[in-house]
């Protein structure tokens, strides 16, 4: 069993950092601000799914297969990511892209993550169907990676690699492990 299969993540209530924690933990202490965060309840049965409301951060439960969920607390209509309605999840080797909700830097993150922290401005962007992009295959037979093709042509741009380093977490054997994601920002000419 891989370490990634035994970990979950949440956003710290004190400093908004993305925290990784071992599955089954009831509380997680943030290494940066020392806030103790309660872990949300375990995932619902297969016929039900859950999503965090983008408006008020309340956990919402809904019937699997729904395309949107309306929050009864703040009345926000939340789009359900396509992968939330599937029983089988995308392989952990897939990555997806999203623009930072604050500085618009393009960030890459593991497919299925609920949020991404930007290394440039430290903003935590929640991932949902309306702002995430299709997962990119990380490996092709010749060992190279390529984004999916598009029908529109874009002018040449310069790219800059951005490293997103989340707070360290503890693996199943009690050792501290780093959580790093690579992002790409473009400076269009």
Swiss-Prot record:
List the induction conditions.
By methyl viologen.
| Consequence of gene disruption | No visible phenotype under normal growth condition, however cold treatment induces the development of yellowish leaves with necrosis, and treatment with salicylic acid or infection with avirulent pathogen causes a runaway cell death and plant death.
- Which Gene Ontology CC terms are recorded? cytoplasm; nucleus
Which BP terms in the Gene Ontology apply to this protein? negative regulation of programmed cell death; plant-type hypersensitive response
Signal peptide extent: none
Record Pfam families:
zf-LSD1
Q: Does the keyword Ribonucleoprotein apply?
A: no
- The primary site where this protein sits is cytoplasm
Task: Write out the tissue specificity statement of the associated record.
Answer: Expressed in cotyledons, roots, rosette leaves, stems, inflorescences and flowers.
List, as start-end ranges, the regions of compositional bias called Low complexity.
Answer: 147-159
Q: Where in the cell is it found?
A: Cytoplasm; Nucleus
What segment(s) does the record annotate as region LSD1-type zinc-finger? Answer: 9-39, 50-80, 97-127
Note the InterPro entries from the entry: LSD1-like, Znf_LSD1
Q: Which UniProt keywords apply?
A: Apoptosis, Cytoplasm, Hypersensitive response, Nucleus, Plant defense
List the residue ranges of the region (Disordered): 136-159
Biological function: Negative regulator of reactive oxygen-induced cell death, cold stress-induced cell death, pathogen-induced hypersensitive response (HR), basal disease resistance. May be involved in the induction of the copper/zinc superoxide dismutase CSD1 and CSD2 that detoxify accumulating superoxide before the reactive oxygen species (ROS) can trigger a cell death cascade. LSD1 and LOL1 have antagonistic effects on CSD1 and CSD2 accumulation to regulate oxidative stress-induced cell death.
Misc note:
When expressed in Arabidopsis, Pisum sativa LSD1 interacts with importin alpha via the LSD1-type zinc finger motifs, suggesting that the nuclear import of LSD1 may rely on the interaction between its zinc finger motifs and importin alpha.
Subunit-structure text: Interacts with BZIP10 and AMC1 (via N-terminus). Binds to BZIP63. Interacts with CAT1, CAT2 and CAT3 in a zinc-finger-dependent manner. Interacts (via N-terminus) with GILP.
What protein does this entry describe? Protein LSD1
């Amino acid at each position: 069993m891989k370490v990634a299969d035994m970990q979950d993540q949440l956003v710290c209530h004190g400093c908004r950092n993305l925290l990784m924690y071992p599955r089954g933990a009831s509380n997680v202490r943030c290494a940066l601000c020392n806030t103790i965060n309660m872990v949300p309840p375990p995932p619902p049965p297969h016929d039900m799914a859950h999503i965090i409301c983008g408006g008020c951060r309340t956990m919402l439960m809904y019937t699997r297969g729904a395309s949107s969920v309306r929050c009864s607390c703040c009345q926000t209509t939340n789009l359900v990511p396509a992968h939330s309605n599937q029983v089988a999840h995308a392989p952990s080797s897939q990555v997806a892209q999203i623009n930072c909700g604050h500085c618009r830097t393009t960030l890459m993150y593991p497919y299925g993550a609920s949020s991404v922290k930007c290394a440039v401005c430290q903003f935590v962007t929640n991932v949902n169907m309306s702002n995430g992009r299709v997962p990119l295959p990380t490996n092709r037979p010749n060992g190279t990676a390529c984004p999916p093709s598009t029908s529109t042509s874009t002018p040449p741009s310069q790219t800059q690699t951005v490293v997103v380093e989340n707070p360290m977490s503890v693996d199943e054997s009690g050792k501290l492990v780093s959580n790093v994601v690579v992002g790409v920002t473009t400076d269009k000419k």
